[in-house]
């Protein structure tokens, strides 16, 4: 499985997930209007939001967390 790990104006960076990590995730942490801190990566299980400002999307196909 290949997941996106970062995005910039120059394109995306990906990584091949290690064995046992069969999900890609994208996590948004709302900071202020029009600005969120976004994290991408691989996971064995879908992470759970830690507070109401956090949204997490998990998926199972290559680069699906773009």
Swiss-Prot record:
Principal place of residence: secreted
Organism: Dendroaspis angusticeps
Disulfide bonds: 3-24, 17-42, 46-58, 59-64
Subcellular location: Secreted
Protein name: Muscarinic toxin 4
Distribution of this protein across tissues and organs: Expressed by the venom gland.
Tagged with keyword Ribonucleoprotein: no
Function per UniProt: Binds to the muscarinic acetylcholine receptor (CHRM).
């Amino acid at each position: 499985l290949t997941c996106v790990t970062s995005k910039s104006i120059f394109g995306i960076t990906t990584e091949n997930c290690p064995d046992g990590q069969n999900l890609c995730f994208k996590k948004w942490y709302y900071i202020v209007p029009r600005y969120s801190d976004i994290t991408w990566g691989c996971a064995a299980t879908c992470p759970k939001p830690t507070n109401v400002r956090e949204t997490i999307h998990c998926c199972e196909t290559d680069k699906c967390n773009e």
